[in-house]
């Protein structure tokens, strides 16, 4: 296709949202009109499915749940007046709490103000808040946020050591839907111990964001924590940024959460239009389906050309992969669906993996995210008439062109600036695109059985560790791994036992491994 034909295709397929100033360009995806026409019946069903979802249908049949994250930014859509009122009241409570913390009306016992936040959560309870904090927090926020989003002891220590001199003015958010997920529970226990070590009463610094009557909710109530905010069973972790999960940390940092909700609502209105060409989420779903042949055959590479959006790819990684990566479809057929997502930021990526994108395996499609406003205020000219922002824009356009010339397809999303409205709109755009695409390929986008399987497997390893240590404590002399496995009733789990013992030994926790480390089967083990 020559340059003039490409320019016409660009105009034909360009979507523009005037209220948000958002552009979506899918002209560099090489589908034709016949392909679009062939998908129309699937889209008709997808639009109908989405309409029923928003009305309160059981859109997550595997867990028998409604899916209501769209109600969070438009409470009037909720299927009952009680839900509408609860959503409105929760938002008002979040804003009131944030204001009291920022003004010092709520303050720690030993300081006039809270200065920092530790946010403890994992998965959707971390990725959304991290993305929004990086994108939107002011340079000097009223409270500076720090995340504990893993079970890595050294990572926890790093956060706590950084806050050693300001722990007495640090608020703690504990975010866990079930209240029993191991990672946030363990993080809370570690942080609680650190506060006790500084003679600080944890309850006077703690906030729970969890399901009503969960174990965490009961603990927070019994201990008299500063506040408790609800999580709903009809909001999944990966779509929870517009709930208390995302709004509490955002509001505390001084981010305009109403504007973020307004941007999401405005995008929701646009993506509710039952017309593929005039619905930006449908255009994304169409492009994804074309790129991967409806089977996820190509990866999605996300390249935001803005430092503040560099966590967008990690956020989308969970949203897309946890939603679409399913073994079975809604009819029980084995389909192994999904789209792999990765990325970092431009133009850094041009000096990293874009070499392979341009000349290597063509197993991907790119998504460029462009921000029109370079910075607040004027820019210095690097060369006559050229700023650093011009260079960044040129790098994006050049990479897009270079990929297309070598038969690599791409999508470009353009926003006027990074602000709460546009970030809310981006989140809503991709939430809807995921839902529509899931309908196109007939999978449940709102459950995660693979995650649950991993949790169960991890629990079985910890149970095995308890049994193995109990056997060792009774033994008087070193024994082989084979013998230990037999006595622990786990003869078929020798490798797992070896790895458990290697870890305990490395941390000097009462286990001694002896023998040739090159030959694990020759080792003997004893309690020290």
From Swiss-Prot:
Q: Where in the cell is it found?
A: Cytoplasm
Q: What pathway does the UniProt record associate with this protein?
A: Carbohydrate biosynthesis; gluconeogenesis; Carbohydrate degradation; glycolysis; D-glyceraldehyde 3-phosphate and glycerone phosphate from D-glucose: step 2/4
A single GO BP: gluconeogenesis
- Report the catalytic activity: alpha-D-glucose 6-phosphate = beta-D-fructose 6-phosphate
Q: What is its EC number?
A: 5.3.1.9
| Gene3D superfamilies in alphabetical order | Glucose-6-phosphate isomerase like protein, domain 1 (3.40.50.10490)
Entry keyword set: Cytoplasm, Gluconeogenesis, Glycolysis, Isomerase
Q: Which GO terms describe its cellular component?
A: cytosol
Which stretches are transmembrane? none
What GO molecular function annotation could you give as one example from this UniProt entry? carbohydrate derivative binding
Q: Which InterPro entries match?
A: G6P_Isomerase, Phosphoglucose_isomerase_CS, SIS_dom_sf, SIS_PGI_1, SIS_PGI_2
Show the active-site residues.
Answer: 322 (proton donor), 351, 455
The source's superkingdom equals Bacteria
- NCBIfam families linked to this entry: PRK14096.1
Question: Per the similarity annotation, which family is this?
Answer: Belongs to the GPI family.
**What's the stated role of this polypeptide?**
Catalyzes the reversible isomerization of glucose-6-phosphate to fructose-6-phosphate.
- Give the protein name, as stated in the record: Glucose-6-phosphate isomerase
């Amino acid at each position: 296709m020559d340059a003039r034909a490409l320019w016409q295709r660009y105009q034909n397929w360009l979507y523009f949202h005037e209220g948000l100033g958002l552009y979506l360009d899918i002209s560099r995806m090489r589908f034709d009109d016949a392909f679009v026409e062939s998908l129309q019946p699937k889209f008709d069903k997808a639009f109908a499915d989405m309409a029923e979802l928003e009305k309160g249908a059981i859109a997550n049949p595997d867990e028998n749940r409604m899916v209501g994250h769209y109600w969070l930014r438009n409470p009037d859509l909720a299927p009952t007046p009680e839900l509408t009122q609860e959503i409105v009241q929760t938002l008002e409570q979040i804003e009131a709490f944030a204001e009291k913390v920022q003004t010092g009306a709520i303050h720690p016992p030993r300081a006039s103000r809270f200065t920092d936040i530790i946010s403890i959560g994992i998965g959707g309870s971390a990725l959304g808040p991290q993305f929004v904090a990086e994108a939107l927090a002011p340079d000097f926020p009223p409270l500076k946020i720090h995340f504990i989003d893993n079970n890595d002891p050294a990572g926890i220590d790093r956060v706590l050591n950084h806050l050693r001199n300001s722990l007495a003015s640090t608020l703690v958010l504990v975010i866990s839907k079930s209240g029993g997920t191991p990672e946030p529970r363990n993080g809370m226990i570690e942080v609680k111990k650190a506060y006790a070590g500084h003679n600080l009463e944890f309850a006077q610094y703690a906030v729970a964001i969890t399901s009503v009557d969960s174990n965490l909710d009961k603990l927070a109530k019994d201990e008299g924590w500063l506040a408790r905010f609800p999580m709903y069973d009809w909001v999944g972790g990966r779509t929870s940024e517009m709930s208390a999960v995302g709004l509490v940390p955002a509001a505390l940092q001084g981010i305009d959460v109403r504007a973020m909700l307004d941007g999401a609502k405005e995008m929701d209105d646009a993506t509710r239009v039952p017309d593929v060409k005039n619905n930006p989420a449908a255009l994304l779903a169409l492009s994804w389906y074309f790129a991967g042949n409806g089977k996820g055959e190509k990866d999605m590479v996300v390249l935001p050309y803005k430092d503040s959006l560099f966590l967008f790819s990690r956020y989308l990684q969970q949203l897309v992969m946890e939603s679409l990566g399913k073994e079975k479809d809604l009819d029980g057929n084995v389909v192994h669906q999904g789209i792999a997502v990765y990325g970092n930021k431009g133009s850094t990526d041009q000096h990293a993996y874009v070499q392979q994108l341009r000349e290597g395996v063509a197993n991907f499609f790119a998504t460029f995210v462009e921000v029109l406003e370079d910075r607040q205020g004027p820019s210095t000219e690097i060369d006559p008439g050229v700023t650093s922002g011009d260079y960044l824009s040129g790098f994006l356009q050049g990479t897009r062109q270079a990929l297309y010339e070598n038969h690599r397809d791409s999508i470009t999303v353009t926003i006027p600036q990074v602000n709460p409205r546009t970030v809310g709109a981006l989140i809503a755009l991709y939430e809807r695109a995921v839902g529509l695409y899931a309908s196109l390929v007939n999978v449940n986008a709102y459950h995660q059985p693979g995650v649950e399987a991993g949790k169960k497997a991890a629990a079985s390893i910890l149970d095995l560790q308890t049994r193995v240590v109990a056997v060792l404590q009774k033994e008087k002399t070193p024994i082989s791994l084979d013998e230990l496995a037999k006595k622990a009733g786990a003869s078929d789990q020798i490798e797992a036992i070896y790895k458990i013992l290697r870890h305990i030994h490395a941390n000097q926790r009462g286990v001694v491994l002896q023998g040739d480390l090159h030959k694990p089967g020759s080792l003997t083990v004893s309690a020290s």
